[in-house]
């Protein structure tokens, strides 16, 4: 973990008409497992395929078809649990969650209510202002995804696409440790970052591969601390669940809107009803979807078609030994080994591809110089072209070559930016480009002195002003750089200007 000290962020406080109120948030995140096949069938999980083309007999609940568990999905769930510093349960079991919906052909969902595969873990959520909160993970269980109902193809009929039916989901359940909309979004972002590093979920929210159910309640200041001391939920308000959120921006908006709705109800003397709600971003409101069900409403019972899932500790240990360096550890290493600021290290570890790129550029070079060029020059140029690091036309070796030329005083900083632009747009070896195009820095003090003498002779008035006010000597530095096409060594120029005007 990061060897840094963080302050806890202050909880979000919303002023009601009568009192101040704090927010308490817990999240159930549904992450689609990165796997080529579904949880209990060999059908493809490819996104965007023709409707009902990725459906096995077991997905369609054909009579006599039995589920067969996909070992790779189990491995991905274990890998995710290990990445979240969670306990792995060597014995887990599947249960049937019974409910009727057109896109659920079995009439039940196979899940893990009583014995999940992953137990308690934790996630460090940083907010970018020097504060961070450790959010506790209660459990992770595997379950089947449902299909998709389509209502906009025909005015009189609805259709069902079963391609998604049976795809493996990991439901990551947090404790009610999140205290504001920004924290909720940061928590989702951190989970996505970790799972992308692990390769267990691509985190694509637009495709529905990562979505969240957000549980929101309100309490008076001080009540949450009593809950922490006693773990007694009666100190907290009644929670409402906002279902199927697939946008961090909408998650923040929905939490704020729902909290204000609850505050208005309580301050008017009413009681908040526990229910499931939907967020309407167009109207900026949540609306009731259904009363919040409890576990007994779904008549859970052990799935008779599936044996308990037993895994060996040696198998778990083998998976653990092959885990990649995760974001927190990578960030700590960048700060320690390269002397980076917390901010720069956060930017460079935001995604795995950027971290790998920086690692390659910084190897054997100044980490701070490498970070400056990757973040300010490369990322800035990529953003301008609406590209990401995977589309970079400049390889780590090429950018490293530019940095080497700067470090060896072969080129100046100004020329380096021109060189970078050439490499970005045309490609090529930086050192060769410098040689062929005559871009090498002028280090011959005789040539620099000759240029400076000409400028001094042509500008006697500026010389007198510079002698009276040494800060104006910078004008002469600029003129020399201009006269040499930016090739003069800035350090040598400054020394000569100071000598002649001092």
Curated annotation (Swiss-Prot):
Gene name for this UniProt entry: gatB
Classification lineage: Bacteria, Pseudomonadati, Pseudomonadota, Alphaproteobacteria, Rhodobacterales
Recorded catalytic activity of this chain's protein: L-glutamyl-tRNA(Gln) + L-glutamine + ATP + H2O = L-glutaminyl-tRNA(Gln) + L-glutamate + ADP + phosphate + H(+); L-aspartyl-tRNA(Asn) + L-glutamine + ATP + H2O = L-asparaginyl-tRNA(Asn) + L-glutamate + ADP + phosphate + 2 H(+)
SMART domains in UniProt: GatB_Yqey
Self-association and partners: Heterotrimer of A, B and C subunits.
Keyword annotations: ATP-binding, Ligase, Nucleotide-binding, Protein biosynthesis
Any one Gene Ontology BP term: translation
Name listed for the protein in its UniProt record: Aspartyl/glutamyl-tRNA(Asn/Gln) amidotransferase subunit B
Superkingdom assignment: Bacteria
Family: Belongs to the GatB/GatE family. GatB subfamily.
Record-linked SUPFAM superfamilies: GatB/YqeY motif, Glutamine synthetase/guanido kinase
EC number: 6.3.5.-
């Amino acid at each position: 973990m990061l060897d840094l000290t963080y302050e806890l962020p202050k909880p979000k406080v919303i002023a009601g008409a009568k009192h101040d109120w704090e927010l308490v948030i817990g999240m159930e995140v549904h992450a689609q497992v990165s796997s080529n096949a579904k949880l209990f069938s060999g059908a493809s999980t490819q996104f965007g395929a023709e409707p009902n083309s990725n459906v096995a007999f077991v997905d369609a609940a054909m009579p006599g078809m039995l589920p067969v568990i996909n070992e790779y999905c189990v491995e991905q769930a274990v890998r995710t649990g290990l990445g979240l510093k969670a306990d792995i349960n060597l014995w887990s079991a599947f249960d049937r969650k019974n409910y009727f919906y057109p896109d659920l052909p079995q009439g039940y969902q196979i899940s893990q209510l009583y014995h999940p595969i992953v137990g308690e873990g934790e996630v460090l959520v940083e907010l970018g202002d020097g504060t961070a909160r450790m959010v506790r993970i209660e459990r992770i269980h595997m379950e089947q995804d449902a299909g998709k109902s389509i209502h906009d193809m025909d005015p009189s009929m609805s259709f069902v696409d079963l391609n998604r039916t049976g795809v493996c989901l990991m439901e990551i359940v947090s404790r009610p440790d999140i205290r504001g909309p920004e924290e909720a979004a940061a928590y989702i972002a951190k989970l996505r970052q970790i799972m992308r590093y692990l390769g267990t979920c691509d985190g694509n929210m637009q495709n529905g591969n990562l979505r969240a159910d957000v549980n929101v309640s309100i309490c008076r200041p001080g009540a949450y601390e009593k809950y922490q001391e006693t773990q007694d939920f009666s100190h907290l308000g009644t929670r409402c669940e906002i279902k199927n959120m697939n946008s961090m921006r909408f998650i923040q908006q929905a939490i704020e809107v729902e909290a204000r709705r609850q505050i208005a109800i309580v301050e008017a003397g009413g009681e908040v009803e526990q229910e499931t709600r939907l967020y309407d971003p167009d109207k900026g409101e949540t609306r009731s979807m259904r009363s919040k069900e409890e576990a007994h409403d779904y008549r859970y019972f052990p799935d008779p078609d599936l044996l308990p899932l037993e895994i060996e500790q040696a198998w778990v240990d083998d998976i653990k030994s092959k885990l990649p360096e995760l974001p927190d550890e990578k960030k700590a290493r960048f700060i320690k080994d390269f002397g980076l600021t917390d901010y720069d290290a956060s930017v460079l570890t935001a995604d795995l591809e950027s971290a790998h790129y920086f690692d390659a550029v910084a190897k054997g070079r100044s980490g701070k110089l490498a970070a400056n060029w990757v973040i300010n020059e490369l990322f800035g140029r990529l953003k301008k072209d609406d590209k990401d690091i995977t589309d970079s036309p400049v390889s780590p070796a090429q950018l490293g070559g530019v940095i080497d030329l700067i470090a060896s005083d072969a080129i100046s900083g100004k020329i380096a930016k021109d060189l970078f632009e050439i490499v970005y747009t045309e490609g090529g070896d930086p050192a060769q480009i410098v040689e062929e195009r005559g871009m090498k820095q002028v280090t011959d003090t005789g040539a620099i002195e000759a240029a400076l003498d000409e400028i001094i002779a042509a500008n006697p008035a500026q010389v007198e002003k510079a002698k009276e006010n040494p800060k104006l000597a910078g004008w002469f530095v600029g003129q020399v750089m201009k006269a040499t096409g930016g090739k003069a060594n800035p350090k040598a120029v400054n020394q000569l200007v100071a000598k002649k005007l001092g």
